[in-house]
Amino acid sequence: MQQLNPSEISEIIKGRIDKLDVTSQARNEGTVVSVSDGIVRIHGLADVMYGEMIEFPGGVYGMALNLEQDSVGAVVLGAYTTLAEGMSAKCTGRILEVPVGKELLGRVVDALGNPVDGKGPLNNTETDAVEKVAPGVIWRKSVDQPVQTGYKAVDAMIPVGRGQRELIIGDRQIGKTALAIDAIINQKNSGIFCVYVAIGQKQSTIANVVRKLEENGALANTIVVAASASESAALQFLAPYSGCTMGEFFRDRGEDALIVYDDLSKQAVAYRQISLLLRRPPGREAYPGDVFYLHSRLLERASRVSEEYVEKFTNGAVTGKTGSLTALPIIETQAGDVSAFVPTNVISITDGQIFLESAMFNSGIRPAVNAGVSVSRVGGAAQTKIIKKLSGGIRTALAQYRELAAFAQFASDLDEATRKQLEHGQRVTELMKQKQYAPMSIADMALSLYAAERGFLTDVEIAKIGSFEQALIAYFNRDHADLMAKINVKGDFNDEIDAGMKAGIEKFKATQTW
């Protein structure tokens, strides 16, 4: 019998080990250890990267979020009921991408870009990464062009510019979504493309928003990204980033876009749920430590970019055009508490906030914009000239009125000047009221502000301010159409427009037809 030398045995074993290729298999493949609540733990996958797509059997995908020493924590994108312990998982070497392009306009898609409106598949083939780095300081341009929301209270006192991030904050059911939807409706003829991201809302609410956009002719100009309350936390967390990528498509090609995130409080809650299930240490209000970064990396992507950036991005196909992505994030507060964790975070990230107040809403002042607390940090430079010129006294009148109204409750007799200020404040407050789904043109808005600024409302009964304004606008659009068209086109204020408005209002008031 042939005997083997111990050294020969060692050589054979070494040779076998050298030939055995387990590294590639073990590093790019893994085994599912546990599945629960949309979270999968995988053993192996040593080469996986943060945010990488992981493929499971049956065409199910996940996203790697926790990279630990001997396991990976991932969220499942979609239904996880088909996954079971012991199944294989593979690295794909790709990060999550969603469809982008003008083919998405007029469509309702989910957080992964799949159409959910029953209008058939999307025709485009272009996709882009969901997570992208925001443009650097060098590529940015200052905000100096307006986004007209169509609301007097906003465009006159808290103007929004192209490339700005303006927060809409307030309690539930006081008109935050209504304000944002009206802003989208007002863009249908402005050349600004819109993206509406619904996060954690009822499907009936989303369907109602889509119907209103369609009725007002704005859906053809809008992409709706829906991650309803029935969707998984992973899709609610991803939806804003998907919508932002779709909006950036227009920005990077020298176009202007507006994106509404409705609302980021629910995204933060979804992210908190994912983080707690991944066993990450909780912080204030049980949110994870990186919840600020969650919103800052999203909102920093909204910007106005320079001509050089657009030219570089399009390889010279588009020249001499700036692009912009304007963001209107919405935050829901609890009982008006703006000092909670998520509201303070988003206030510090954005370029101003529109604060909606429950007390004003309940007293019939709609939109319930509190001009004293609301601010636009960069929009002033972007405001239309005529609106800027005529709105100077509006904010002051409202601020003085609020102060005097509180004082007048205790004082029995008021002097003439104080009484006049109070009455003027009441008239301006009444003038700032506006119906939903009725955004105003620049000329209509300028006319209302002119009447208030130049004292033409002094002898109009407070109860009739609304009907006076409607009749005045109808009169000017009928008998002074040329003047109104001129204001809408140029947005300038000069002596000719001043004289035309003054003469027209005096003539209208003489008719007493309101």
UniProtKB/Swiss-Prot annotation:
It catalyses: ATP + H2O + 4 H(+)(in) = ADP + phosphate + 5 H(+)(out). ATP binds at G170, D171, R172, Q173, I174, G175, K176, T177. It is found in: Cell inner membrane. GO terms for molecular function: ADP binding; ATP binding; proton-transporting ATP synthase activity, rotational mechanism. GO terms for cellular component: plasma membrane; proton-transporting ATP synthase complex. The record marks S374 as: Required for activity. F-type ATPases have 2 components, CF(1) - the catalytic core - and CF(0) - the membrane proton channel. CF(1) has five subunits: alpha(3), beta(3), gamma(1), delta(1), epsilon(1). CF(0) has three main subunits: a(1), b(2) and c(9-12). The alpha and beta chains form an alternating ring which encloses part of the gamma chain. CF(1) is attached to CF(0) by a central stalk formed by the gamma and epsilon chains, while a peripheral stalk is formed by the delta and b chains. Produces ATP from ADP in the presence of a proton gradient across the membrane. The alpha chain is a regulatory subunit. Belongs to the ATPase alpha/beta chains family. This is ATP synthase subunit alpha. It comes from Pseudomonas syringae pv. tomato (strain ATCC BAA-871 / DC3000). The lineage of its organism: Bacteria, Pseudomonadati, Pseudomonadota, Gammaproteobacteria, Pseudomonadales.
